[in-house]
Each structure stands twice: as structure tokens, then as C-alpha cells.
């Protein structure tokens, strides 16, 4: 580091080149004085603290300055004069990734483009993903339905026995019958995968683009469709339900294997009709979700709004329900988020994507058009959404991805909102504050999925790209800004025809699962008359010591 007296800046002598990181230079009153680095460290820390850097970054920078790597850097950058501080911190974050993320050396680059078709039956799991040092990939199954997307652990995140997956394929009659020969076989929409042996069974058929899926606190599964008329379906006892079929999506008619009306799955018409993906569900039954809509898709219409469903009868307690009629999702009201740049009132004109917000009442059946009519804030394709279980403030923190479009220089982002009163929704009460948390760039862009790592609170951002990457991002520290303190790349998909999706951690934060979605299956056999995807288990994540005590 070089410190110059501002009054004598023009007359300062040239700093000698070739000074190693074993020393620091202090230029003052026309004199160059050489000081041992150790004796100057307290002054360095004091100066960096004055700049407003958080303790983590100060410690990181100081530790790096003491390292042999900086000796080479200091010489190359003329006594640290030319070293870019952002690069300095980024390299340090990567070199100390075990401390901050619990993984070894991160990836320097994404996986190289592959030949097509890439996927074959002979490949092992490591052929599917490039991963950070210390991580290990293995197959859960290679027989999940093609376009396997998001999933929920069952019966819990702590001790899961199954993954309950949404399959994002279109509604399709497969040209044959279910066992028994009476019911036409449609595309798989919701599947369960047994973790002990990788066996796959279909729970529900006949959906359109099943995407967002969550386990509720009352032990049901909520599965949703990413379509302009996308519906939401609640499933009870998902391990005991097989091959049920939606025969009429508009009416929500669902039959079991014998052609009888289903008693295990119901369409929740009180929830908004829209293109669902990310979902956050509180124990009371409040549902947060976004409409995956690109601005301009509809004439003179904004992008997708963020919605909140408030149940008419909020759930009390955490015991499982005995029948679907007991669910808080049976009735309630739907609201769209309207964000303002002003405090206490709604500004005219363009408006803001960040700021303080209120919830505006809309109808469930016409949520998308109503949101545009009442002036709800539109975003660029809201996709995944997660609740922050480690948030300790009042209310609920929910974070979601806006995919953007990298080709247009819109690299996408992660936004986070804090709703101080989840059960409240009033156009005159600005109970929500929204801010950007991660902003995309030329390397990390078009974020699609999102996950919190339990224990650490680290945020994982998953791209919607060929050879898509997964980035681990630190929470915001005590520094001045309100964004992530830095991200590293920990995984990249090797198959150019596929993307990573559905990434989620078990409750201990040490194991994650993901889908290698919509790969080119030319060289792979069909299963149950349908193309397949690989589901991967990633182990080797370590919880940094500071979170263990």
C-alpha cells in the first residue's frame, strides 16, 4: 500500500519498482521511507476500517497481504500501486473458499461446450458436472422424467427418504394406457424418487410444465404449472398416490387409477392463475410467488408481478392435516406487490423495482391482468423464490431471481424483500421493502434457480444457460452496502444441451441435489414411454468452523 500526503502529491518522488510484499512504502514530505509490513499492519487495518470495509474483508485483505502470493503480485503491480482492489478481494475469496463456503478451490471457468448428443448410458456422474475441489458427484437416478425441474424433500429436509419432483414437460397423451388398460397415459407431471435405490414412480399426470413445488408445514405437497393459465395442485400422502391424471385442467378434474374422482389431489383455485415457478410458504399458509412473464409478452403490459396469498383461516400449529379440506390453501385472498420510490405514497410514471411496497388486491382467476391494471410492479421473468429461514428480523424475508436476457446486456439479478407483516395486505400499508442482492454480469447471468444453504445462510444462484453454472454467494456483512459480499463458481454442467436446476440442500447444509435438465436423450432409452433426465447428489460441502459453535 502507498500512502501519499495530499498536499505534496505533485512533488512526490517516484516509488522504486521491485519492492516486494515483505515491505510497505510510506511516501511523506518528499521522502520514501521503508517500513516492515508487520509494523504497519495496525495502520493498514485502521485505514481499511475507516473506509467502511467489514471485518471479514479487512481480515481477508490482511491475510492475503501476508501471503507469498502477494509478493509476486506486488512486484507485478509496482508495489501494489496498480493492483485492482476488487480483483484482489475476489482472488482472496477464491483462495479462502474453504473458510467462507466450505468447498475447496472454486472453478476458474465454466465447462467447455460439448458435442451433441452428449449424454450416454456409460457415463458416470462426474461426466455430467464440473465441480469445485472437495465435492463429489453421484447419481441418484438416471430415470427421472425429461425436464425434471424443482423438487421438495419428503418427509423432511432433515431425514429425507424421497425427492418429490416437478416434471416440466408439456401436456401429452403418450399413446398408450396405464396399467389396467382403462385410463389413457399422459405425461408425468409429479414424480417421487426413492433415495435408497433411485426408483421413480409417477404421482400425477397431465400437467403443463410442472415447475414450482414445495412441501408445506402441514405435510402436503404443492405443485404448480409454469403456463399462462398455470394451476396449483395440493397433494396429500404423496408416497401413497400413483398415476392419478388431470383430465380437465380448466375444471381441475382429477381421477385416480380406477377412473374415480381423486381424494388425494385437488386444484387450488384460491391461488393465482399464472406462470408459477418459485414458491415460499409460511407455516400459517401465506404463499409468496412470482409470475414468470417477460415484459412486452402481452401488449402494453409489464413483466411478471410478485404475488401473496393470505389464507382466510391461517394455520395454527405444525401437525399434519388429515384431509385436504383442512388445508389453509382452500380459501383466501390474492395480492400483487406495488413498489414505490417514495415513502408513504405511490409515485406516478415509471415507478421502481426496489423500494417500499404495498399489497394490492387482485382476483385469483385473473391475477396477471389484474396486476397490470392496478399498477403492480412488473419484473423481468421472476423465477425461483425461497424464504430465508435464518432471517431473524420481524416478518419474512423472501428472495427471488429475475432471469433477464444476457444477449441484451440485462444479466439478471436476485432481489430480496422483507415483508414485516406477512398476514397483512393493504394498499395503504407499505409493509414490504425490496432491494437488489446479487447483480449478474458477463460470467454470472440469467439466474433461474436459487437456494439458501442451511447453517451458513450462503446464497446459491443457478443459471439458466447452456453449460449453466452454480455460484455460491456470501450473505451481506456489516459493511455499508446491502448486497452479497462476494460469489464464487462451484459447479458447471458439462452437457451443452442441458442446464442445472432444482438445486437444494438437506437440512445439515452438507449435501445438495440437482437435476441436469432437458438433456439431449438421443442416445438414451425411454423409461415409462418418456425421455429421461439425470438427478445428481453432491456431497463434500463442509460447514465452516465459525457456524459450528
Regions found by a protein language model. Give the residues of each.
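Sequence/structural signature of beta-propeller domains
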Residues: 75-549
Amino acid at each position: 500500500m502507498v500512502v501519499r500526503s495530499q498536499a505534496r502529491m505533485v512533488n512526490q518522488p517516484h516509488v522504486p519498482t521491485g519492492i516486494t510484499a515483505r515491505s510497505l512504502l510510506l511516501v511523506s514530505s518528499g521522502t520514501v521511507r521503508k517500513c516492515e509490513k508487520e509494523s504497519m499492519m495496525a495502520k493498514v487495518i485502521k485505514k481499511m476500517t475507516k473506509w467502511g470495509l467489514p471485518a471479514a474483508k479487512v481480515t481477508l485483505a490482511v491475510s492475503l497481504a501476508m501471503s507469498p502470493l502477494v509478493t509476486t503480485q506486488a512486484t507485478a503491480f509496482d508495489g501494489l500501486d496498480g493492483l485492482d482492489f476488487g480483483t484482489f478481494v475476489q482472488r482472496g475469496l477464491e483462495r479462502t473458499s474453504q473458510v467462507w463456503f466450505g468447498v475447496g478451490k472454486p472453478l476458474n471457468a465454466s465447462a467447455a461446450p460439448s458435442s451433441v448428443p452428449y449424454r450416454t448410458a456409460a457415463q458416470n456422474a462426474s461426466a455430467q458436472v464440473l465441480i469445485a475441489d472437495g465435492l463429489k458427484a453421484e447419481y441418484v437416478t438416471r430415470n427421472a422424467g425429461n425436464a425434471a425441474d424443482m423438487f421438495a424433500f419428503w418427509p423432511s429436509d432433515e431425514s429425507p427418504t424421497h425427492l418429490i419432483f416437478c416434471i416440466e414437460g408439456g401436456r401429452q397423451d403418450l399413446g398408450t394406457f396405464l396399467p389396467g388398460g382403462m385410463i389413457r397415459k399422459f405425461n408425468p407431471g409429479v414424480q417421487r424418487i426413492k433415495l435408497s435405490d433411485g426408483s421413480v414412480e409417477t404421482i400425477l399426470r397431465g400437467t403443463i410444465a410442472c415447475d414450482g413445488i414445495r412441501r408445506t408445514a402441514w405435510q402436503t405437497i404443492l405443485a404448480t404449472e409454469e403456463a399462462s393459465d398455470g394451476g396449483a395442485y395440493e397433494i396429500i400422502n404423496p408416497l401413497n398416490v400413483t398415476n392419478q391424471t388431470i383430465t380437465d385442467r380448466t375444471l381441475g378434474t382429477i381421477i385416480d387409477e380406477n377412473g374415480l374422482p381423486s381424494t388425494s389431489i385437488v386444484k387450488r383455485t384460491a391461488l393465482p392463475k399464472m406462470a408459477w415457478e418459485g414458491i415460499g410458504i409460511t407455516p400459517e399458509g401465506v404463499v409468496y410467488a412470482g409470475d414468470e412473464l417477460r415484459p412486452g409478452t402481452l401488449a402494453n403490459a409489464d413483466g411478471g408481478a410478485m404475488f401473496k396469498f393470505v389464507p382466510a383461516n391461517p394455520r395454527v400449529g405444525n401437525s399434519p392435516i388429515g384431509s385436504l379440506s383442512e388445508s389453509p390453501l382452500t380459501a383466501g385472498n390474492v395480492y400483487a406487490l406495488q413498489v414505490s420510490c417514495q415513502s408513504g405514497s405511490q409515485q406516478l410514471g415509471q415507478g421502481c423495482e426496489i423500494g417500499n411496497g404495498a399489497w394490492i388486491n387482485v382476483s385469483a382467476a385473473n391475477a396477471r391482468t389484474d396486476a397490470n391494471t392496478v399498477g403492480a410492479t412488473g419484473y423481468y421473468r421472476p423465477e425461483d423464490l425461497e424464504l430465508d429461514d435464518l432471517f431473524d428480523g420481524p416478518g419474512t424475508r423472501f428472495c427471488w431471481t429475475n432471469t433477464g436476457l444476457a444477449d441484451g446486456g440485462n444479466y439478471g439479478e436476485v432481489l430480496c424483500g422483507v415483508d414485516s407483516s406477512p398476514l397483512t395486505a393493504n394498499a395503504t400499508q407499505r409493509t414490504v421493502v425490496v432491494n437488489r442482492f446479487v447483480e449478474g454480469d458477463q460470467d454470472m447471468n440469467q439466474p433461474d434457480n436459487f437456494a439458501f444453504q442451511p447453517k451458513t445462510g450462503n446464497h446459491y444462484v443457478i443459471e439458466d444457460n447452456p453449460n449453466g453454472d452454480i455460484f455460491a454467494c456470501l450473505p451481506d456483512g456489516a459493511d455499508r452496502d446491502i448486497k452479497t459480499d462476494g460469489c464464487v463458481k462451484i459447479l458447471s454442467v458439462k452437457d451443452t444441451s442441458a442446464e442445472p436446476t432444482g438445486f437444494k440442500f438437506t437440512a445439515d447444509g452438507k449435501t445438495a441435489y440437482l437435476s441436469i435438465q432437458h438433456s439431449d436423450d438421443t442416445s438414451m432409452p425411454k423409461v415409462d414411454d418418456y425421455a429421461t433426465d439425470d438427478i445428481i447428489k453432491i456431497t463434500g460441502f463442509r460447514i465452516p468452523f465459525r457456524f459450528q459453535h
